[in-house]
C-alpha cells in the first residue's frame, strides 16, 4: 500500500487518521459487544459508554499461550517467559532475561528471539519443537538458527522444569507420533531461562459475546469473502481471524475489512436477514489443506477471489487445486509447502464467469 519497506512505527500513519478527522479513544477497553452492534466501553476519562455502531471491525489480535496451557511438571521458578514477553524486555525495556537459554517451540517469535538473545550475549542451548516440522518461516530457521549454529530438535518437548526459586535446567524427551514422551530419550540441559514459543490464541471473547460463530481449527470467526462474520454488520481481520506470518497480509486484510464495513454502514437500506445455508457455500478443505480464509463465499461471485490457507503437513513439489461444482477450475504448482507458512491462491474473475451459481467449492493439495 505504501510502495515502500517500512518499520512498524512508520506503518502507523497516525497523520492520516488525524487528517481524515477520525475520532479515536485511547486507554479505552471494550467490555461488551452485542449482536445488535451495541459496543460498551470503559475508560478513566469517560467512564462507561455505549455506542450504537452501524458496522464493527473485530481486530483484537491474539495472545501467546502461557506455561499453564502446557501442563509441564515442575515448580514455578523465575526464568520462564513467553517469547513475546522476552522480546519486549530485551527490545523495549533493555533487560536481558537470562544467560543460558532453552527455547520450547519453533514459532517465528521464538526463532527471532533465539537470534536476538545470541546477539545480546546469551547462549541458546537448543530449540525444541513438539512437531516433526518447524512452526516458523523457512527463512527464519536459516537466518536465526542455522547462521548461529543453534540446534533445532524436532519431535522433542520439555518433560520437566528443574529449580525452585530460579530455573536450573530442563529435561527434554523425544515424542512419538501421538506426541507422547518416549521413555529413555530424556536429556538434561542446564539453563537459567526457558522461553515458550508454543502458539498464539486469537482474542475472541468479544466475538463470542456478539454470538459470532468461530472456526474450531483457527479459533477465529467464520467469514465470507468480504470478511463479514455470520452476524450481520460485524467484520473481522488480522490475527483475531487467523494467525498470520507477515504483517503485509494483516494490513491487506484490514483494508478489505475496513472497506467492506464502510460500504455496509453507508447503505441507506440495511440488508435483509439471510440464511447462511441458502446464500453461502462453505469452502471444503481436503487433501492436506487445514483451513481456508474465507471459510464460506456467496454462491454468485462477480469478482476475483483470494483464498488464504495453511497445509497440515510438509509437502515437496505439489499443486493446489480448486474445484467448482465438482470440476477442476484452477491449478497452481508449488515447489514446496509447510504448515508454518501461509499459502494463498487467487481465483480470477473469468473462472467464476463460467459458473452461473457455485454449488460446491473445494480446495485441495496434491503431491507431484
Regions found by a protein language model. Give the residues of each.
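FAD-binding core/adjacent interface of flavoenzyme oxidoreductases
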Residues: 10, 14-100, 176-184, 195, ...
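A conserved FAD-binding loop/helix module that cradles the flavin
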Residues: 237-284
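Surface beta-strand/loop "capping" patches
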Residues: 270-315
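A Rossmann-like FAD-binding core segment of flavoenzymes
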Residues: 14-41, 51, 118-205, 303-336
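Single conserved hydrophobic/aromatic residue that forms the stacking wall/gate
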Residues: 1-8, 12-13
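FAD-site-proximal beta/loop scaffold in flavoenzymes
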Residues: 58, 80-90, 192-244
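Short, aromatic- and glycine-rich surface loops/edge beta-strands on solvent-exposed regions
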Residues: 320-322, 348-368
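Rossmann-like NAD(P)H-binding beta-loop-alpha module
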Residues: 85-134
Amino acid at each position: 500500500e505504501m510502495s515502500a519497506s517500512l518499520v512498524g512505527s512508520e506503518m502507523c500513519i497516525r497523520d492520516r487518521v488525524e487528517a481524515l478527522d477520525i475520532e479515536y479513544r485511547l486507554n479505552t477497553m471494550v467490555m461488551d459487544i452485542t449482536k445488535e452492534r451495541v459496543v460498551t466501553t470503559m475508560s478513566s476519562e469517560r467512564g462507561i459508554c455505549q455506542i450504537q455502531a452501524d458496522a464493527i471491525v473485530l481486530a483484537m489480535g491474539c495472545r501467546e499461550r502461557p506455561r499453564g496451557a502446557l501442563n509441564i511438571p515442575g515448580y514455578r521458578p523465575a526464568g520462564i517467559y513467553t517469547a513475546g514477553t522476552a522480546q519486549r524486555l530485551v527490545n523495549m525495556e533493555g533487560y536481558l532475561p537470562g544467560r543460558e537459554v532453552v527455547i520450547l517451540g519453533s514459532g517465528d517469535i521464538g526463532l527471532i528471539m533465539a537470534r536476538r538473545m545470541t546477539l545480546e550475549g546469551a547462549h541458546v542451548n537448543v530449540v525444541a519443537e513438539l512437531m516433526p516440522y518447524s512452526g516458523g518461516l523457512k527463512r527464519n530457521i536459516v537466518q536465526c538458527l542455522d547462521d548461529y549454529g543453534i540446534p533445532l530438535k524436532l519431535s522433542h518437548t520439555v518433560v520437566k522444569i528443574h529449580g525452585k526459586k530460579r530455573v536450573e535446567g530442563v529435561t527434554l524427551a523425544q515424542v512419538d507420533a501421538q506426541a507422547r514422551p518416549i521413555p529413555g530419550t530424556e536429556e538434561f540441559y542446564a539453563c537459567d531461562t526457558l522461553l515458550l514459543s508454543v502458539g498464539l490464541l486469537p482474542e475472541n471473547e468479544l466475538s463470542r459475546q456478539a454470538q459470532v460463530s468461530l472456526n474450531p481449527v483457527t479459533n477465529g470467526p467464520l467469514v465470507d469473502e468480504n470478511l463479514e462474520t455470520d452476524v450481520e454488520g460485524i467484520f473481522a481481520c488480522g490475527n483475531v481471524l487467523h494467525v498470520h506470518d507477515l504483517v503485509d497480509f494483516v494490513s491487506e486484510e484490514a483494508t478489505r475489512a475496513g472497506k467492506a464495513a464502510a460500504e455496509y454502514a453507508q447503505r441507506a437500506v440495511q440488508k435483509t436477514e439471510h440464511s447462511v445455508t441458502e446464500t453461502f457455500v462453505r469452502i471444503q478443505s481436503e487433501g492436506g489443506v487445514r483451513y481456508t480464509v474465507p471459510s464460506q463465499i456467496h454462491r454468485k461471485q462477480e469478482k476475483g477471489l483470494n483464498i488464504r490457507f495453511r497445509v497440515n503437513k510438509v509437502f515437496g513439489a505439489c499443486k493446489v487445486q480448486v474445484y467448482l461444482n465438482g470440476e477442476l477450475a484452477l491449478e497452481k504448482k508449488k515447489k514446496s509447502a509447510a504448515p508454518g507458512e501461509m499459502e494463498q491462491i487467487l481465483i480470477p474473475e473469468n473462472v467464476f464467469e463460467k459458473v452461473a451459481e457455485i454449488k460446491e467449492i473445494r480446495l485441495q493439495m496434491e503431491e507431484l
